[in-house]
Every structure is written in structure tokens, then in C-alpha cells.
Amino acid sequence: MEKSLKKKIIVRGAKEHNLKNVDVDIPKDGLVVISGKSGSGKSSLAFDTIFAEGQRRYMESVSAYARQFLGVMKKPNVDYIDGLSPSIAIEQRTISNNPRSTVGTITEIYDYYRLIFAKIGKAYCPNDGRLIEEQSLDKIVNTILSYSEGSKVILFAPIVRGSKGSHKKVLEKILNQGFNRVRINSEDYLIEDALNLNLHKNKKHTIEIIVDRIKLGNNVRVRLAESIETSLAVSNGYLRVEIDNDLEKIDKLFTEHNSCPLCGFSLPLIEPRLFSFNSPFGACSECSGLGVTLEFDFESICPDTSLSFNDDAFLTFKTSSSWSVAIFKGLAKHYNFDLNTPIKDIPDKVLKQILYGSNEKIDFIYQSKEMEAKELDGGFHYSKTFEGLLPLLKRRYLATESESTKIFYENLMSKKICNSCKGKRLSVGALTVKINGKDIQDLTNLSVFDSYVFFENLQLDMVDEKISKEILKEIKSRLKFLIDVGLSYLYLNRISGSLSGGEAQRIRLATQIGSALSGVIYVLDEPSIGLHQRDNEKLISTLVNLKNLGNTVIVVEHDEQTLRTADYIIDMGPGAGILGGEIVAKGALIDILNSKNSLTGQYLSGKFKIDVPSSRRKADKGEILLLGSNKNNLKNIDLSIPLGVFTVITGVSGSGKSTLLNEVLYPALDSRLKLNEKYCDGFKDIVGYEKIDKIIQINQKPIGRTSRSNPATYVGFFTEIRELFAKLPDAKSRGFKAGRFSFNVKGGRCEKCQGDGYLNIQMHFLPDVFVPCDLCKGKKFNEETLEVRYKGKNIHDVLEMSVFEASKFFENVPKISHYLKFLIEVGLEYIKLGQSATTLSGGEAQRIKLAFELSKKSTGKTFYIIDEPTTGLHFDDIKKLLEVLQRLVSNGNTVVLIEHNLDVIKQADYIIDLGPDGGLAGGNIVVSGIPEEVAKCENSYTGMFLKNLL
């Protein structure tokens, strides 16, 4: 019995969130999938109970000193858990918003890159391409002796190299050092004769001491070494050698420094920190290792060129400033234009000189406002070369110590590629070091797959191969893990903050596989999100490999392929929120398929399904044509999106879907509809936008950054609720207005916690602890406000209701029930009205935004762009969502989705499949048309998987 217990994780009485006293035995060392409707309690069981308790027990085992760095987790609401081992959660959250954090740094691949470049990289002079290397005396001697016996060798000590001057003192010093002969400008002289040459002081000269002439043979090593040592000593470490072997004349430069012997370019010590853009030792000094700098541009400081200077066209040079007036009066006089001339009418050449400066001296006269008002002559006269408006503003920005001024300037600046390092982040010295012709940033500019190919085919000599063997092993294994989790398309220099939650999670997963731990409980949150079916197979293989290492892998997942691969399934339900929190079925796949209570099982068995539509809308209502899309990996493609139909953009991960829709199409349409073309880039032209009147982008960004933001405030019906409470007789008798029922303003809120509902307690040896406010007991409002009740419920009680409960409670209040209806339609009946925005997933935030848009009055000419709306949705929730989206289209609107879910794709009226692969191998339109046409395309991965469903 004791042995069998150790093979299970035993959970008894789990009551966290909506869990209803759940008891479950989970087999260890297997792939366990927890399924169920959105809000049914999957994450509450996996993350908030099992992982939380495993983590908490580990934390308790370390010292108080260590705990202050590790953090402390509260005990989950569960009676008993046994069989736990150390647990690791791999969640869907952005890794870091730090611009210095990249895919290469977070996977530690870049650390190994720095190491291999420091060990076997070869430095080349940036000026002449010559190999730079430190050479010892013995190495120089051996190199010269390697030439054929009998070769004539002349050793020169370079003293002056291409410098102006008569160099009299240099020649005198050479004489005093005891040398007899010199070579000056390619001519040989006795030192006495050289002193009488009277070299022209304004011309460049080269002076070398002729140290020795040697004929190579058996007994010359000692003499050669002594002469070389002398040459290096008098020339500060440089030596030039002429070798004549009768067949050819060879000219070689040697140096004992890490510098170019020809131009003198000096390189610091080659070590790993030289290649770190986070270290002042290796970072570009201009951009401090960011690769970009903040710069002013003409469009930002002069948004309306139809205005003149006197109309205050320039936001940073107003007529109210005497200095600005002085500058522009001087410029106008010098370049012959009027201060009332619209900026757009100033000649381009003149405008360029005004913006960027010139070498011409310009006369300026500064007059105070008092002198100008009295039309007095005089003032401060000065003449100088004008640096240009943009450099002047940059200088002011760098010089100011005023925080408000800095913020004002930064709002007018934009990020530009660093002019010094060209976006490579590193110093010139670091970029001179190369392996097979590539510097370290050239390698980070490659995709994960291309990087793997580069190192797999890397040819090295015997010495370098031995030095780099272990480093290469680590690099290739990490790259292979990333490929195995479907991230072959990512570039190693990609900023980690730009990764989706799914990509970030799979990077963590790849890192964990690389660590090769065993005996661990891994808890993952929908790792298949954002993955094409082709890549999903790789991901599942990775999860199985993680299990085979001797770990327990618990996955919260809706993906059918993952469910069918699982060793054990726990299906939560039967509904969401208060209607969920129970285990409706558990066991192997066959047990779930045979369960009458399992909604998941009924979809997997085919009893319930999302049908292929009997007919599809025809694309005959016009189109929007986006021509020449070329941003990121897009290959100058022409995109045609039919209006009035349901379109899905498909393609493998990294094929360019998000770039095309979110970074090119949306800004293009948004700017055209708002008559503002400033933000348009990445395409040549857009046609047909006149046929729509509004564009709405519904993404997965949070609906708010603080605990005060919630679904009720975002969608807008909290205002209606507050006004309803303010109209109650009790509220009127107390003189309460609608503002009394807001936790954001003084009056009705609890002032001890300022409407947060909790207090932040600072601990000395522990992290900050958030505890419910002891005055309002976490209710956010003061006692007087809570005494006002509607149908027996106060404002706090209402905010604690789920959307489903609230819909029943407010069914006779149309202004409120109208909004709640749409939240239910998008599958959010389980969330609370006052649930903090910080606790909502990306998918939940997106569906709240969708509900908000649905609640508005439709014009029938709206263009919707929605990015993967099925994120976090069960089969049944997807069915509901599709009904909503199809209704939007039936009302005359256009809906365009980015989606991988095949149930959604098969319902589309029109598909545009990008690819054929990810990264550089993507960016093309592989096929477009109705699903049946896409399924026939042999080059389409989407078509390959779609074929079986039609």
C-alpha cells in the first residue's frame, strides 16, 4: 500500500476558488491532461493547488534568509496533499519587457556564443580587413624561419607611419640609439645623410630603421631572435619584414599587440565580456548596447507643414520664445525665406540645412520680448555655424535635468537604428571578431533553425575544434530543443518582450528539457496556444520526452491531439464558475470517451461536434487590396481580403500572419480611415478602404494594469450599476450620488485601503504580503455605502457576482443586462463583474473586448481583426464563439481572424494561408480561397490537416 501511494499525487478536499471539495488521485511519472470548459477549475486544481503546495513546501525547507529572495506562497485551500515532489510551473506570461532581454539571452545561447567567440574567434581590422592577432617573439621567429633556406630577410622597425613633419628629432634619436641605416619613403639612407634631407613638414612621411639583413640558414635563429627583439623594442611592438627568395618578394607586418600593424587599430583583450551588450566593456558607446537611440525627426516636431513659423508650426520652437525667434529670424534672413511662409513651401535643400545644419556661418540677433514690443534696435549680436534644429534639440534633451522637460522631449522622439553600431549593439572591437566570416551579431540575426545549420556545418581546424567541442555541444543542444518545441522560426536577437505567451512558455519548456531534471512535477498552461498543427506534433513529442526523463507532466489543455496522447485525463465541469469546480470524469482516454457526464468526451467521441457549414458566403461584395507588404519576413506580397465574409489567416508559426494583419494591415486601414498617414509603413498602397467605416482590432493585451480595472468598468456597465444604486430611495435620503459607489474616488470607498480591498504589508525577511483590509474586510467601500442595497445586495455583493448570476439579478434592467448578454455569448459567464484585470488571461481579456464591441450599435460596415480568439477555449466555448462571429458577418461586417484551430478554419468563407514555413522561409501567400480549395493545395501544411475534416 505504501509503495502504491508513492506512485500517486493524492489530493483531498481541494476548495481553492470554485473547486468543490475535490478529491483526486493523479498517477505520477505520466502525461496528465486537465480538461474542461473555460472557468471550470482546471487552473485552480493544477496551478493554485498542486503546484502552489509543492512550491510552498519547498520554500519552507529553506532558511529564512533564503526565503526573502525566493518569496513565500500562501497555503492553498486544501485538506490534504501527499506524494508531492518539487514542482515547476511553466506558464503563459511574457518573459521580460527589458529591451536588453532577447531570445538568445534568456535561453543562455548568447552566453555560449560569447564564450566561443572569445575562444576561437579571429579578429580582422575594420579598416583593411587584415587579420589581427597577438604574436609572441617565438611565433614571429618561427614564421620567418618557415621560409626557404637562402631567402634574404630585411628587418625594419617602423618609427613614423604616414605622419606629417620634418621629424628631425626622430632621426636624431635613431642616431643616438646606434642605428646606421634608415628607410624613408621607400628610399634607403645612412642616418647621417638622412639628417640632412630637410623633410617637408606639411607632407606625410614614413620612417623605418633598418635593423638587420639576414640570409636564412641553419645557424641564424639566435641572431634573428635578437634582431626581432630589438625591432619590437624601439618601435613599440611593431616589425616589418621583407623576404626575397628569388621567386617572389614578400612583405609582412608583425605586432606583439592586439592591433592592426598597418593602421594601428587597437583591440582590447578578447574575452567573453567583450561580446556582452549589457557590459560597458562590450556595448556600443553611442546606444549603450540597445541598438537603437531616441532621435527627433521632422514629422514629430512639425506635424502640420501647412503652418509657418509664425503660426507655431514647430512644437519645440514657439514664437513665445525669444531664443526661437532669434534663431528663425537669422535662418530666414540667411536662406531668404519669410517667417510667414508655410514650412512645406520652403525649398527642400534649405529645409534640410535648417534641420541638420551646415558649415555656413549665420548671423543671429537676440532681442528680449520687451525690446521686440517697443521695436527697439540692438540686442545681442552673434555669428556661428548653425548645428541644425534636430541636433540642437538632441543636445538640449541630453543636457536638461528637468524631468518634465525630458518627458516633453521624449514624446516627440522615436527609436532609430543606432548610427554607430547599425543596430548591432556592440563596440567596433567586438564586431571585428569573426567565425567563418560572421561576427556574433550576424549569428544572432539568424533564425534558430539557420543557426543550428551554421554550427552543424562549421568547419574548424584541429586546435579550434578541440577548444570549442564542449561549447558547440551546448549551443547545438539548446538550438535543437527550441526546434523541437516548434520555435525554429524565432530569431535569437528578438526582444523577449515581443514574444507571445505561448512562445515564452515554449522557450521555458525547451530550457527545462535542457536541464534534464527528473522526479519533478511540471505544470503547464496550454502549451499548444499559437501552434500550427504541424508544430503541435513536435510539442507533444517534447512533453512525452519530459515525462520519459522520470517526471510528472500535468498540462491544462484543450487541444484534441494532446488529449488523445495523455496517459491520464481529468475532466472538470460540468459548467463554468459556480457551475463548475467538480471532476466530471477521469481516467484513460477510453474512460473519458465513454463518460456521459463529460462534455470533453462527447466532443472527442464525435457525439458533439462543430459542423462544416452547408454553404459559404460568396466573396462578391468588394475587397480591400493591400499591395507590396514587405515588413519583417513578408516577401512584397499583395493581399486581397474580401469584404462581408468570414476570413481566416492561417500558416505555420512565424510565417508572417501577425506581421501582415497587426503590423501592416491594421495601421494602414486605421490611418486611412482617420485621414492620418503618419504611421503607415511596410506596404506600397492600399485600395478599397472607402467601403468600410470603422476598423476594430481585438487583441489579447490586458484590459487594465491595476486591480481597480475589471470587466464591469471596461465594458462600461459599472456606470449604469452606480447610477442604479444612486437612484434608490435610501441613497437619495443620504444624499449619495453615483460617485459614492466608485472605489476610485473619495467619499464612498474605504479610505484605509483606498478602495483596493487589501493592504500591502512590508516584511523584513520576507516579500511584501497583501492582506485583506481589516476595516472594510476586503469590500473596498465604507460601511455607510454598503448599507445601501438593491434587491438585498450592496455594491460589493454585486461586484462579487459572476456574469451569469448578474444576468439573472439584472434581467429587468435593460441598460445592464444588454452588456451581460454579450459577455455570456463569448463564454465569459463565469468571471466576476469586479474581477481584477490583472488576474484575467489574455484570452479572457480578448473576449471581454469582443463583448464590448458587440454591445455597440453595428453599422454593418465594420472591419474586425481578431488574433487567435480561441485561446483558452474548450470545444463547446469555440462553438459559441463561432456563432457570435458568424452573426457579426451576417450583419454585413467583415471579420478577419488569425487562427490555428481547425474547427474555426473549416467554418471560414475564405482562407489566406501564409508560408510555406516560418521565418525567412515564410512571408509568402501559399494559397487563398475557400477551405475546399486550400485542402487541395499540396504545398499548404494547413491544407494537409484540413483535408481530413472536410
UniProtKB/Swiss-Prot annotation:
GO terms for biological process: nucleotide-excision repair; SOS response. Signal peptide: none annotated. Pfam families: UvrA_DNA-bind, UvrA_inter. It is found in: Cytoplasm. Transmembrane segments: none annotated. Disulfide bonds: none annotated. A zinc finger (C4-type) spans 260-287, 750-776. The keyword Repeat applies. One of its GO terms (molecular function) is ATP binding. ATP binds at residues 36-43, 651-658. Forms a heterotetramer with UvrB during the search for lesions. The UvrABC repair system catalyzes the recognition and processing of DNA lesions. UvrA is an ATPase and a DNA-binding protein. A damage recognition complex composed of 2 UvrA and 2 UvrB subunits scans DNA for abnormalities. When the presence of a lesion has been verified by UvrB, the UvrA molecules dissociate. This is UvrABC system protein A.
